């Protein structure tokens, strides 16, 4: 598809494997992952620097695991507040829903507050590790065109200079108003909320109470959130007839803050900004050699803090697939599984966010009264209370089709779900999280068994070419048993007993884990070879010259 562009001779030409439009969190994460895989990447950003004001304030365990996968989590954690509870309050201040999950099944706290600009800066700095990755600011994408084997981008600098980029693939991470998506005429279906909200960020937190509170005041609903580094965020609904200019006036801002602070004059304002909450989903995530990710593919209200995290899921799902395709290890049909796996879950998170917004600010007054009464009764039912406390209402990513092989009923299968990340003990005695032992790779993990036993030599060659790590998990007391060592297999001890419980629950002894930490397949030693062949087929992996044997049997 050709797009018209200015007929001006470009002054600079770039040639890369992947061009990324947008240096927001999703674009930066994509660039970090592809960079560590050796892919030649160019990130282009219209602005002259990263956005420096707070935006998203919630980062979950899955997103922290994604940060871990690119070696940045230790630099991100200082800008987070772990175990950040969310509490819904009635107009009288009674907590009717306390969301405070204490699980760390994926290695990190499930709910965390964070300062997005500082985390974005960590990701930008992370790109300096890779000589194959560049990030250019003050570059406006004016036009682009797709050919059979490449995408051509036409850029303009602040000085009016033109530049051309030739890339094998274009990943559009250019936000909810995505130029790329609009140019390709991809429908962005959904709705815009009728109410706006004004966000007020304050330094030297004048409240300094922990957690986040959503106060369901029928007169003017508001949010109060404690953020890292002594930042307090307030969000107030903008009422009909009010404008941003009016609310920003000192006397009106004072009136707003007097609702939540005893002394609204003694504050250090960082910024005030009005937001409109949208709930929209792109009809397609892949258009030939262009892929949409993050807000360019879906936008949602902020009430569950899942806009940022959904973008991180996009980046993790897409990046490893794109790397395999560029490296010639898989055909580009693998990229079709990106939309197949991500779009339905993005829609589920949009629906959850819209529902949470309706709980905070019901469209009709009687709905708020009903909410308060029903919630008061339900809080006396322990199963209901645990349902909210443990955040069980959050739709966990589960893929029913795509780059995976499932045997049996999907409902109870671990295939298509994220694998746990407990602590494990290495043979040198060090204790670490499982992903640290695996790296940014596929893994075949076996409980007690040699994971190579059920594979032919050709299969071992094929999966090692993907960087696959072969892991044998044993009870921690067996970690130093020499006779159980196998060449090419990493042995780890089950420090917390969680891996034993996982394998026992799912009636399997082997799991194939994808680089994004999702379970691609389960097996036992005698069926592993057959399962790996099926998985190689659905992932359209390229094969060695020799025919791959089906499986090894006793």
Curated annotation (Swiss-Prot):
One of its GO terms (biological process) is 3-phenylpropionate catabolic process. Keywords: Aromatic hydrocarbons catabolism, FAD, Flavoprotein, NAD, Oxidoreductase. Pfam families: FAD_binding_3. InterPro entries: 3-HPP/3HCI_hydroxylase, FAD-bd, FAD/NAD-bd_sf, PheA/TfdB_FAD_monoxygenase. FAD binds at residues 17-46, 285-295. Its cofactor is FAD. Gene3D superfamilies: 3.30.70.2450, FAD/NAD(P)-binding domain (3.50.50.60). GO terms for molecular function: 3-(3-hydroxyphenyl)propionate hydroxylase activity; FAD binding. It catalyses: 3-(3-hydroxyphenyl)propanoate + NADH + O2 + H(+) = 3-(2,3-dihydroxyphenyl)propanoate + NAD(+) + H2O; (2E)-3-(3-hydroxyphenyl)prop-2-enoate + NADH + O2 + H(+) = (2E)-3-(2,3-dihydroxyphenyl)prop-2-enoate + NAD(+) + H2O. Pathway: Aromatic compound metabolism; 3-phenylpropanoate degradation. Its EC number is 1.14.13.127. Catalyzes the insertion of one atom of molecular oxygen into position 2 of the phenyl ring of 3-(3-hydroxyphenyl)propionate (3-HPP) and hydroxycinnamic acid (3HCI). Belongs to the PheA/TfdB FAD monooxygenase family. This is 3-(3-hydroxy-phenyl)propionate/3-hydroxycinnamic acid hydroxylase. It comes from Escherichia coli (strain SMS-3-5 / SECEC).
């Amino acid at each position: 598809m050709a797009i018209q562009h200015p007929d001006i001779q470009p002054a600079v030409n770039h040639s890369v494997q992947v061009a990324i439009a947008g240096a927001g969190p999703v674009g930066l994460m994509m660039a970090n992952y592809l960079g560590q895989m050796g892919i030649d990447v160019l990130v282009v950003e219209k602005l002259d620097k990263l956005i420096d004001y707070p935006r998203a304030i919630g980062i979950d365990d899955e997103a922290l695991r994604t940060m871990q996968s690119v070696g940045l989590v230790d630099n991100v954690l200082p800008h987070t507040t772990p175990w950040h509870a969310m509490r819904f309050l009635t107009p009288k201040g009674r907590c009717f829903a306390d969301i405070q999950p204490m699980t760390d099944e994926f290695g990190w706290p499930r709910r965390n507050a964070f300062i997005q600009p500082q985390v974005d800066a960590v990701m930008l700095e992370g790109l300096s590790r890779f000589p194959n990755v560049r990030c250019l600011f003050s570059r406006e994408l004016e036009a682009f065109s797709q050919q059979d084997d490449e995408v051509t981008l036409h850029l303009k600098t602040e000085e009016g200079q033109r530049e051309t980029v030739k890339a094998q693939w274009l990943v559009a991470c250019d936000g909810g108003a995505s130029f790329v998506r609009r140019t390709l005429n991809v429908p962005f279906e959904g709705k815009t909320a009728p109410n706006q909200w004004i966000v007020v960020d304050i330094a030297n937190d004048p409240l300094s109470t922990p957690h986040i509170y959503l106060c369901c005041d029928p007169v003017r609903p508001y949010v109060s959130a404690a953020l890292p580094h002594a930042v307090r965020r307030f969000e107030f609904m903008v009422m009909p007839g009010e404008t941003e200019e009016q609310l920003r006036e000192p006397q009106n801002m004072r009136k707003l803050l007097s609702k939540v602070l005893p002394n609204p004059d003694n504050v250090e304002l960082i910024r005030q900004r009005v937001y409109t909450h949208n709930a929209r989903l792109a009809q397609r995530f892949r258009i030939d050699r262009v892929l949409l990710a993050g807000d360019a593919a879906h936008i949602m209200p902020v009430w569950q803090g899942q806009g940022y995290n959904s973008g991180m899921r996009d980046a993790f799902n897409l990046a490893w697939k794109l790397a395999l395709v560029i490296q010639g290890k898989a055909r580009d049909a693998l990229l079709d599984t990106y939309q197949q796996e991500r779009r339905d879950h993005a829609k589920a998170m949009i629906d959850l966010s819209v529902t949470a917004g309706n709980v905070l600010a019901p469209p009709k007054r009687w709905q708020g009264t009903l909410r308060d009464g029903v919630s008061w009764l339900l809080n006396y039912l322990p199963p209901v209370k645990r349902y909210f406390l443990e955040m069980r209402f959050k739709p966990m990513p589960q893929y029913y089709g795509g780059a995976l092989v499932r045997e049996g009923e999907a409902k109870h299968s671990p295939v298509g779900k994220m694998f746990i990340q407990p602590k494990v003990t290495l043979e040198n005695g060090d204790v670490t999280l499982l992903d640290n032992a695996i790296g940014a790779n596929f893994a075949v993990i076996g409980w007690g068994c040699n994971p190579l036993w059920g594979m032919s030599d050709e299969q071992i060659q094929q999966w090692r070419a993907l960087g696959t790590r072969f892991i044998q998990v044993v009870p921690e007391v067996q970690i130093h048993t020499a006779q159980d060592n196998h060449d090419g297999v990493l042995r780890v001890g089950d420090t917390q007993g969680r891996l034993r419980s996982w394998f026992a629950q799912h009636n399997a002894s082997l799991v194939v884990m994808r680089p994004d930490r999702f379970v691609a397949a389960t097996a036992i030693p005698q069926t592993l070879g057959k399962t790996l062949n099926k998985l190689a087929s659905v992932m359209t992996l390229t094969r060695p010259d020799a025919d791959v044997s089906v499986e090894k049997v006793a």
